């Protein structure tokens, strides 16, 4: 955050944040409201939600939704972390793919026919069409997402400028800590769910306010969220489904339904199920997203109705600093998308999916807490934060 502000000289900072389930196909550690508090305490001025229909998706759709929201908010500049660290290289790579689109698409198909996952096939295709040192390594996860951000900016004819910050020391999927006080999201999650886990183990890798709010969530609600807590619900659902039922679920393609129904029979945990399910053709993340759609019963028809090929249909405001509130007041007439401060009375196909995802997310809670949290989510107004006193209002 500090590097972003230093690099962009921004007047205000806006974060587009996933809701209950994340792009890599797993539940968020804590609710979006606690994560909103974390973001505000760390210097973000406006926090808005990326709807489930965009957030639990491949990088292209994820980026398209996020950029459409930022564009609607009249953001002048975006900043993202990447393994490459040179923004010119992202523009060069997008340009190279466009110029070699026919060859690129043919190569992707060729590599997929050889049994590779889409992500692997794409990475291999880029290696064949990109020879210059000024192109990015498309096998790296943050480079892939950054590439899609730039592509979305150009496709949406946005005037938005882009900056990138090089990720040092720790890669996104690294599972262990290093001694440079930089840790990946994966390693932090792994530590939090390990035996004898302690928040003190991660305190040097995350902001103090974040550590405090993580501890507070676990104390108040008795848990942090991970896939294993949903496994019994997930397995029960699959045990009651036929292959035909599964084929209606979003991202269940190419006979994957048969493999899923076969492997769930002998799996006693989500991790063991994933180990049995994974193949060369499907990445772990791709399979986790498919499992998330099964858990939330998100169908192909629902995603079609959400019209994800277009921009996000609304802006759900989760939190704001005083500076952020001033920005919205000054610019609200220019913002064409509806800004939702709650979802109780608004109706849209995208929001129908969102409500289901929230219901599933809180399903691991005991009653009456589960019902209370679900009701609160629909009526919850944006969290307000006074940055001068560092207090929530």
Curated annotation (Swiss-Prot):
Subcellular locations according to the entry: Cytoplasm
Domain of life: Bacteria
UniProt GO cellular component terms: cytoplasm
InterPro entries, per database record: Rossmann-like_a/b/a_fold, tRNA(Met)_cyd_acetate_ligase
SUPFAM superfamilies: Nucleotidylyl transferase
GO biological process, one term: tRNA modification
One MF term in the entry's GO annotations: tRNA binding
EC primary class: ligase
Binding site for ATP: 81, 142, 167
Swiss-Prot/TrEMBL keywords: ATP-binding, Cytoplasm, Ligase, Nucleotide-binding, RNA-binding, tRNA processing, tRNA-binding
EC assignment: 6.3.4.-
Catalytic activity from the UniProt record: cytidine(34) in elongator tRNA(Met) + acetate + ATP = N(4)-acetylcytidine(34) in elongator tRNA(Met) + AMP + diphosphate
PANTHER family linked: TRNA(MET) CYTIDINE ACETATE LIGASE (PTHR37825:SF1)
Function recorded in the entry: Catalyzes the formation of N(4)-acetylcytidine (ac(4)C) at the wobble position of elongator tRNA(Met), using acetate and ATP as substrates. First activates an acetate ion to form acetyladenylate (Ac-AMP) and then transfers the acetyl group to tRNA to form ac(4)C34.
Family per record: Belongs to the TmcAL family.
Listed name of the protein: tRNA(Met) cytidine acetate ligase
Lineage: Bacteria, Bacillati, Bacillota, Bacilli, Bacillales
């Amino acid at each position: 955050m500090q590097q972003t502000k230093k690099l962009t000289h921004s007047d205000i900072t806006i974060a587009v944040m996933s809701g209950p389930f994340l792009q890599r196909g797993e539940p968020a550690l804590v609710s979006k409201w606690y994560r909103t508090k974390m973001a505000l305490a760390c210097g973000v001025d406006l926090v808005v939600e990326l709807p489930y229909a965009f957030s639990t998706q491949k990088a292209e759709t994820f980026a398209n939704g996020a950029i459409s929201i930022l564009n609607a908010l009249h953001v002048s500049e975006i900043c993202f972390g990447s393994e490459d660290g040179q923004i010119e290289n992202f523009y060069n790579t997008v340009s190279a793919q466009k110029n070699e689109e026919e060859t690129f698409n043919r190569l992707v198909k060729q590599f997929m026919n050889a049994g590779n996952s889409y992500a692997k096939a794409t990475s291999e295709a880029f290696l064949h069409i990109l020879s210059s040192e000024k192109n990015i390594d498309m096998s790296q996860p943050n480079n892939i997402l950054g590439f899609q951000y730039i592509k979305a900016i150009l496709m949406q004819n946005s005037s938005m400028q882009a900056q990138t910050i090089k990720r040092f020391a720790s890669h996104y999927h690294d599972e262990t800590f290093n001694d440079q006080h930089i840790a990946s999201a994966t390693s932090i999650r792994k530590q939090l769910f390990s035996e004898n886990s302690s928040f003190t183990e991660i305190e040097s890798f995350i902001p103090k306010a974040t550590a405090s709010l993580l501890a507070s969530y676990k104390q108040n609600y008795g848990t942090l969220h991970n896939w294993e807590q949903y496994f019994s619900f997930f397995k029960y659902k699959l045990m009651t489904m036929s292959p035909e039922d599964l084929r209606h679920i979003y991202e269940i393609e190419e006979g994957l339904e048969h493999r899923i129904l076969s492997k769930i029979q002998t799996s006693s945990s989500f991790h063991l199920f994933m180990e049995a399910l994974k193949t060369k053709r499907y990445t772990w993340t791709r399979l986790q997203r498919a499992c998330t759609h099964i858990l939330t019963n998100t169908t192909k028809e629902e995603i079609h109705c959400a019209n994800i090929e277009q921009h996000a249909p609304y802006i759900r405001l989760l939190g704001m600093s005083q500076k952020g509130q001033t920005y919205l007041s000054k610019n609200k007439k220019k913002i064409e998308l509806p800004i939702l401060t709650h979802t109780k009375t608004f109706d849209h196909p995208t929001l129908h999916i969102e409500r289901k995802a929230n219901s599933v997310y809180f399903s691991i809670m005991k009653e009456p807490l589960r019902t209370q949290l679900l009701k609160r989510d629909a009526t919850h107004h944006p969290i307000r934060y006074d940055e001068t006193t560092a207090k929530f209002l």
